[in-house]
């Protein structure tokens, strides 16, 4: 990756009058703002369909897009909704918060209304989209329609015939739920249209999109339901083991994610075709792809299904470099960022080196005794050119709140490293951002850190549910003053996007 800079901001966190950030004019305005701030990258979180915990890392599909991101204004322009209908909808009270329960009710109602008026069955572009994407779209749309029929229950709790995909049941539900299936295909068609238009606009402005994919699929996903042989499921399609990570300084019982683990021997037998296809599709949507939990390709933490915590888990070997050799042979060299944070064994480090992918460096980890990695790896003077540096990620505290929660001794270390004993604590985050801008690595800064916000703007606190993935940026926060500051530091340290 070239010497450059970017901003991390989930699509969901964009300003919007419709309850959640989406592919509306505000997204295009943000692209313009990034360009004028001298940025090269816009890093986002996964775009998948979110489920009960609202996490983009637990999606109903590895391929489908989140219909919440569909611009209602575009549907108004198409004549399938009216501006008054959108204005009357109640999406939530706060401009800086996402109320997912209201979104589910109101967005769902409006999207169904749009579908009912669309006459989509006579749309040649829709027919072509369905044909080109039937390899994932047919299973996904049927999965969602059947899920609605079973009142939202996970697929492992459905009736046996459709849970195990008996042919007579598949045929029955395709006939019985035809219009529901078409509705879910329609949503994916609109998502695809609007996202590709936004990405094309960003690329025209010299802004490259860094997408993000979780290593695992959710258990309650069309992927696991349609391809049970590729996962560690028993003869009744119930998991035998699930994913997570062991205890560390941030979580004494570890993290129990609950995702089904891959049956890697099956993937190897097919030449890793599922993964090749998945990554090929990602590069249709993004310019660069960050793969979450990269260490899971070297070793993955296997937790017996039904465990209450991650503590009973153990490490097992993953596919290693063989997978990425197969991907490169099929797709050529692609730009991938390896999320290699936390405790890294020597074999994981070797996998990252062998892959040639840039790893990640997080400034907060350099001074935080709770982190299980090597602190020296995260000191900016040690960042290699082939790395991407962050103040923090979506899983971390904001820089301002992090500095307040570390010990006084750790705060002293920060001051010593900065050689800065005079800057007021409330402004020290700017010095820390400048610190990684001086490093050799590509720099990606979360929007909250540029704004100097506290943990009320934190995106996610791992191992918790209920208050995550909710923060939204207010349009008034995208000021010319901030843009000028970002442009100035970007220029000063040779990271300016002159495109």
Where in this protein do the model-derived segments appear?
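Conserved, well-ordered alpha-helix/loop/beta-strand core segments that scaffold catalytic motifs
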Residues: 184, 188-217
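Outer-envelope exported proteins of Gram-negative bacteria
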Residues: 45, 208-210, 214, 288, ...
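Surface-exposed amphipathic alpha-helices with a cationic face
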Residues: 35, 195-203, 328, 352-353
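N-terminal regions that are enriched for targeting/export leaders
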Residues: 1-12, 28
């Amino acid at each position: 990756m070239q010497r450059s800079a970017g901003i991390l901001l989930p699509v969901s966190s964009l300003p919007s009058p419709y309850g959640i950030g989406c592919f509306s004019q505000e997204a295009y305005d943000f692209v313009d703002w990034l360009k004028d701030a001298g940025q090269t990258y816009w890093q986002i979180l996964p775009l998948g369909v979110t489920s009960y915990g609202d996490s983009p890392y637990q999606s109903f599909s590895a391929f489908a897009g989140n219909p919440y991101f569909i611009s209602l204004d575009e549907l108004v322009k198409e004549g399938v909704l009216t501006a008054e209908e959108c204005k009357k909808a109640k999406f939530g009270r706060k401009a800086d918060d996402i109320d997912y329960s209201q979104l589910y009710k109101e967005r769902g109602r409006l999207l169904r209304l749009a579908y009912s008026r669309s006459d989509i069955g006579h749309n040649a572009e829709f027919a072509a989209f369905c044909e080109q994407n039937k390899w994932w779209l047919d299973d996904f749309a049927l999965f969602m329609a059947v899920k609605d029929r079973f009142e939202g229950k996970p697929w492992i709790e459905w009736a046996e015939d459709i849970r195990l995909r008996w042919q007579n049941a598949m045929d029955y539900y395709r006939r019985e739920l035809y219009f529901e299936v078409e509705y879910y295909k329609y949503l994916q068609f609109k998502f695809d249209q609007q996202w590709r238009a936004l990405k094309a606009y960003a690329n025209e402005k010299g802004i490259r999109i860094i997408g993000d994919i979780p290593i695992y699929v959710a258990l309650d996903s069309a992927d696991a339901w349609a391809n049970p042989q590729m996962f560690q499921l028993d003869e009744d399609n119930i998991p035998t083991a699930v994913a997570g990570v062991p205890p560390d300084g941030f979580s004494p019982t570890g993290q129990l994610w609950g995702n089904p683990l891959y049956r890697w021997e099956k993937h190897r037998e097919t030449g890793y075709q599922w993964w090749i296809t998945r990554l090929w599709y990602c590069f249709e949507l993004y310019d660069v792809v960050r793969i979450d939990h990269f260490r899971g390709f070297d070793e993955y933490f296997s937790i017996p299904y039904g465990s209450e915590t991650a503590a009973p888990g153990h490490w097992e070997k993953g596919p290693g470099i063989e997978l990425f050799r197969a991907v490169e042979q099929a797709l050529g060299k692609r730009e991938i960022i390896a999320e290699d944070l936390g405790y890294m064994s020597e074999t994981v480090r070797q996998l990252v080196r062998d892959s040639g992918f840039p790893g990640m460096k997080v400034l907060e980890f350099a001074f935080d005794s709770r982190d299980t990695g090597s602190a020296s790896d995260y000191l900016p003077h040690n960042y290699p050119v082939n790395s991407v540096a962050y103040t923090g990620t979506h899983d971390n505290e904001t820089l301002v709140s992090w500095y307040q929660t570390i010990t006084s001794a750790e705060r002293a270390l920060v001051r010593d490293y900065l050689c800065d004993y005079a800057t007021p604590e409330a402004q020290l985050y700017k010095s820390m951002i400048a610190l990684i801008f001086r490093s050799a690595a590509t720099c990606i800064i979360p929007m909250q850190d540029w704004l100097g916000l506290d943990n009320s703007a934190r995106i996610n606190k791992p191992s918790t549910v209920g208050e995550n993935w909710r923060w939204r940026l207010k349009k008034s926060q995208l000021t010319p003053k901030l843009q000028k500051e970002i442009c100035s530091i970007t220029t000063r340290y040779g990271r300016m996007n002159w495109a």
